[in-house]
């Protein structure tokens, strides 16, 4: 398995080997599906949309609803405004959405389609019901990643739909490209703190809705469009992820004077402390004892298990916002990051992670815009005890005989992980348990018969 991966790196400027990211439209579709009765529309070919839906469906084990402009060779050359107009008429007639969220693809961006102008024509020609709300985001696949696409779509929601009116006393939460289980955990924390909130996009009952047997075109979840409109009147905004949702928080602050706190992603003790304190300050509430108890239990867990993971070398890869949180957590656990790699290019990410690791580990590699081939090369030169990341690390895991803790997107070879949080004190506790017990499983596997103990 991967036997011919060389240890020494060769400079590569125009080729990626085994990407550590996916494309912008996937993030845009995921964000759009977090809005109630919203139909994501891919302004591209049927093949583009099939790929997006496949990636989301394989991770979440749920159907990902979306439509397409169905580009062909001819329309790609001569223009596709007629396709988009026909698609909007068809999807409003058949699917009857409240909101349509259009994102572009490589071909649409390459031929220079101006979606905004086409939508003006749709309005002027009265092709669809004017009560249906439409927004559009530019999401070319050859720039950025799924994180960029998510950020662009949420930014489009805010710039298109928000309306200033009277204060609502609520706190905005922009989750980022995170799992439904994480959003549900954040909402639970806010409920304990008795904070009224507007969470958008909210995928908790979209990818993770209960199976009731009741028919329906759209899942019951998602943020109502009225809540997004009302987000301009909130007491503050917390973007859990700097790169996925931070732009929308800045727009709300700049345009409507809604105070914004952007990051850090609440994974681990310190980052969750920051989130809880930011929420308490913006909403002007006290931190309840129940959360203090949760924090105390997490500290107790980490203390109990620390001999099993302290000093262990770890390689982490995935989305940048999740990686900053995971890096903070493993540093709190006393582990040693050898490499932290994301496929999304960002100098801010590199600076933040380097600041978390600090001078204690000057040999650590922090890479943005990297790929899985680079990750493997580094691990071959600097062996690790544990991998933390998505499904695509399993090949490196087998090749180097290193255990893998699956975290992030996509995870297509294990079931139900998206239901459980990694955020908050409860999420960190779950990660601590998984990391410690994965290392203990490896210790048992490698132990000779005379060292196989019932007590660790």
Swiss-Prot record:
GO terms for cellular component: molybdenum-iron nitrogenase complex. Keywords: ATP-binding, Iron, Iron-sulfur, Metal-binding, Nitrogen fixation, Nucleotide-binding, Oxidoreductase. Binds 1 [8Fe-7S] cluster per heterodimer. Its EC number is 1.18.6.1. InterPro entries: ChlB/BchB/BchZ (IPR050152), Nase/OxRdtase_comp1 (IPR000510), Nase_comp1_CS (IPR000318), Nase_Mo-Fe_CF_bsu (IPR005976). [8Fe-7S] cluster binds at residues 23, 48, 106, 141. Its cofactor is [8Fe-7S] cluster. GO terms for biological process: nitrogen fixation. The keyword Translocase does not apply. GO terms for molecular function: ATP binding; iron-sulfur cluster binding; metal ion binding; nitrogenase activity. This molybdenum-iron protein is part of the nitrogenase complex that catalyzes the key enzymatic reactions in nitrogen fixation. This is Nitrogenase molybdenum-iron protein beta chain.
